[in-house]
């Protein structure tokens, strides 16, 4: 029974690590899925895939990096694989559904403007190349350049430079009139 107890101990540790990750990063994982997939059904599938792969990955977690870095590394890898798979099937991305935002107490117009701005920003982020999307989503999740570099394989200096460049591109595109077709930063 020593082998069975060892397996159960491994599963328990895997479950504990997954539970910790979910407690700390659950909402961030949902935001990440939203940044990579506009279609609500595909986003649910992506989110489930992220959670499943994350749970599986804890079999190999060795604490050489922080839990946060591990979670984002796995989640971004799954999301990028999803994008590649979707592009191979030539499926057209659909518009992002209305974001779940807390109601603005000021007035209905400012709440509507905020939702429109968030939708516009999400659409622009979705048009970025996967690596740039990964960098900006990490930035928006308040990860430092070193942590983002661990996830992406870029140097912290390269991450900082990309963040600056992406922010400038997004700001410029955000203030331009909406254009149909074409991918930004590709």
Language-model segments: residues:
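Internal acidic/polar
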Residues: 2, 89-114, 144
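Amphipathic alpha-helical segment used for protein-protein interaction
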Residues: 105-136, 141-146, 150
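A short, charge-rich alpha-helical start-of-domain segment used by transcription regulators
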Residues: 6-31, 44
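Arg/Lys-rich amphipathic alpha helix in sigma70-family domain 2
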Residues: 73-94, 114
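C-terminal edge and immediately downstream basic/flexible tail or linker adjoining helix-turn-helix-like DNA-binding
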Residues: 2-9, 16-18, 91-94, 151, ...
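Structural recognition of an alpha-helix C-terminal capping motif at a helix-to-coil junction
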Residues: 45-52, 56, 65-77
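Amphipathic, Lys/Arg- and hydrophobic-enriched alpha-helical face
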Residues: 21-40, 56-57, 125
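DNA-recognition helix of helix-turn-helix
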Residues: 76, 146, 150-177
